[in-house]
Amino acid sequence: MTKKVCSCINELPDDLILKILSFVSTKHVVVTSLLSKKWKSLWTRVPILKYDVRDHTRFERFLDKSLFSHQSHVLESLHVELSVTLWNKDIGPWIRTALHHHHCHLRELEIDACIVHTVLPPELFTCKTLVVLKLKGIVIDVEAPLTTVSLPSLKTLHIDHSSLFDFGSLQMLLSNCNFITDLMVIRESRFFFAEYDVSWCKTLMALKLEGLKDVISISSSSAVCLPLLKTLHVARMEDFNNDSFCRLLSNCPVLSDLTLEEKTSDVLLNLDIDMPYLQRLSIITRVDADSKHIFSLMKNYTRKLAIIAPSFKYFSIQELAYASRYRYIVRVRLGVPSKLEDASTFSRIVHLELSICSERSVEMLVDLLLCFTKLVVLKLEHVYLLTPLGRWEPPSLVPECLLSSLEALEWKGYTGRYGDKDLRSNRLKRT
């Protein structure tokens, strides 16, 4: 770095420098202390600390030292990510240090601990200033069963792939988050427990549940109404009850983004309610979807939603790859019927995104292009770069959209191999 550049940076206000450093990992932020006397202590006032712990000894010592050196009255966010090699590391002491040393202003705590056993101190669940709490890992535990939970400021709670103590403690934790707006609970596929009633939380705006038994207790006598809920994602539910889910959907007046498994999505086809704000629908399928199956899903749901959801524009079909990891197969955007000469289902589709993962995907692409006569934007993504496409025979008919309406083509993961070249040359020379 030249003296001129250093001089220009030094002239910036401290608040602006601290803001810039907040977007950089803590490892690199601490290095700035070598620039000058001014920078020697400047890093200790950065409000956000981000640690990516991949080394057993050296990085642990660095984290310990930097966490204690940081000025306690300004730390607002702590993010610790553990690599898979640290499967036996207990990061509880680091969390306790953050809570005790920086308790006054800690607003965000995120633990991304893959396949580790982590002991969480009970003080974590009585932090008055905590707004965001995200826990991700296989085994997360507390030193003792929860008896007291007081998180009055908590707005966002994510529990992702975590075996989090016992169900009673989990219920206590969730039931004492009275002002939460963003809730995500994802359990591993082999862990199911009693249904969890979400109807108590009237402030929810985003809800994602996976691996539970149900979303609303059948025995619940409370009125089911989530007046602010905009995003709902429900998947891998054991003994899912359509009646309880209907109660929920019928009382989410501003719902705009909905994700369901195919086996439970039939409730939409049989539910006669108005969903005036619904714009996005994602269906998760566990089968190797072919063109016929894709067309059937699109036709059924777009026709139904055209009646009950006048704002509906985005439809996607996803495939369950493994655990709770999904990859999309097809995403489409529908045009406004009043602006199209033909308002039929497939002619409304103006934007198509397709995941290319096999010859099956290429055949599906051809079938979709033949049906989507008004397509304007086409985006392709090659998911498996190590699986080249074989040679394929181009269709005898040229899709109408390639000759008239298609304006934009984007292809991510293009490999330049034979199958890709065949597909590219055939598509482009016709467009």
Swiss-Prot record:
The domain of life is: Eukaryota
Query: InterPro entries of this UniProt entry?
Result: F-box-like_dom_sf, F-box_AtFBL13-like, F-box_dom, FBD, FBL13/AtMIF1-like, LRR_dom_sf, LRR_FXL15/At3g58940/PEG3-like, LRR_PRU1-like
Question: Mind telling me which SUPFAM superfamilies this protein's record contains?
Answer: F-box domain (SSF81383), RNI-like (SSF52047)
* UniProt LRR repeat ranges: 56-82, 88-113, 135-161, 162-187, 209-236, 237-262, 264-285, 357-382
Give the matching Pfam families.
F-box, FBD, LRR_2, LRR_At5g56370
UniProt keyword annotations, A-Z: Leucine-rich repeat, Repeat
Report domain FBD positions: 391-423
Task: Describe the location of the F-box domain by residue ranges.
Answer: 6-62
Provide the protein name.
Putative F-box/FBD/LRR-repeat protein At3g56780
Q: Which organism is it from?
A: Arabidopsis thaliana
